[in-house]
């Protein structure tokens, strides 16, 4: 994504009610809509916000400003989770080997995303978060706990024995969870994540693990930013 003229490869996850468009090489840059055209347009709409995540890093993120710059290289059949509002199908790219170089790249991406998330959480301290039309919506710390809970579930999907400690101080739990994610990336680079769990269920690949952690954190980072009154 170093040049706006270069095409950005994206994949589409097509459910019955929702379609997700995701940038293959840019974990966390993934948005949904009810049809393919709008999903791609929404991905472009969020491109500047995604790029800002890396503004304080050495990651060169210059996103395109026109859906014509996208190359749709894969279409995946979605499922009920897709329609519920979360991407849930791994693109073929995520089955590629996960070596030490990819571990370093993935950790750099996640670290930048975590720091941006932390800045949003800090900006929301003492602020009211706008409620939904029916009065719903988690408060700031509830959003953080929700992200941590999802991370714990994702860790188990790559064979890590990890559970969220809801009684622990929030800051401590954030650090513990992120260290576990870093450890999982190391295990992935060493080839220690099996294809199946002990009971036979398929585990995620390390690349897809990174994609899901990034998407979910970015999604709630933007939720916090959008809901600050």
Task: Label each region the model flagged.
Residues 67-70, 126, 190:
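Generic secondary-structure boundary/loop-capping signal
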Residues 2-6, 48-102:
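Short, charged, surface-exposed hinge/linker loops at domain edges
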Residues 9-10, 15-36, 40-59, 107, ...:
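Short, contiguous alpha-helical
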């Amino acid at each position: 994504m170093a040049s706006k003229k270069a095409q950005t490869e994206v994949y589409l996850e097509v459910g019955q009610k929702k379609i997700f468009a995701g940038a293959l090489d840019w974990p966390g840059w993934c948005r949904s809509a009810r049809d393919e055209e709008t999903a791609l347009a929404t991905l472009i709409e969020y491109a500047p916000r995604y790029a800002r995540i890396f503004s304080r890093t050495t990651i060169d993120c210059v996103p395109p400003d026109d859906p014509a710059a996208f190359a749709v290289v894969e279409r995946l059949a979605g499922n009920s989770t897709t329609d519920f509002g979360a991407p849930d199908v791994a693109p073929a790219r995520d089955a590629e080997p996960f070596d030490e170089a990819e571990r370093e790249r993935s950790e750099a991406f996640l670290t930048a995303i975590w720091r941006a998330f932390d800045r949003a959480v800090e900006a929301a301290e003492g602020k009211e978060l706008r409620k939904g039309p029916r009065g719903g919506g988690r408060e700031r710390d509830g959003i953080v706990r929700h992200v941590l809970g999802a991370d714990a579930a994702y860790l188990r999907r790559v064979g890590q024995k990890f559970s969220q400690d809801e009684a622990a101080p929030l800051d401590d739990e954030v650090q513990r969870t992120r260290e576990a994610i870093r450890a999982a990336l190391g295990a992935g680079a060493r080839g220690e994540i099996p294809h199946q769990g002990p009971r036979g269920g398929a585990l995620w690949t390390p690349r897809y693990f990174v994609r899901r952690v990034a998407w979910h954190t970015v999604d709630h980072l933007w939720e916090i930013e959008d809901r600050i009154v």
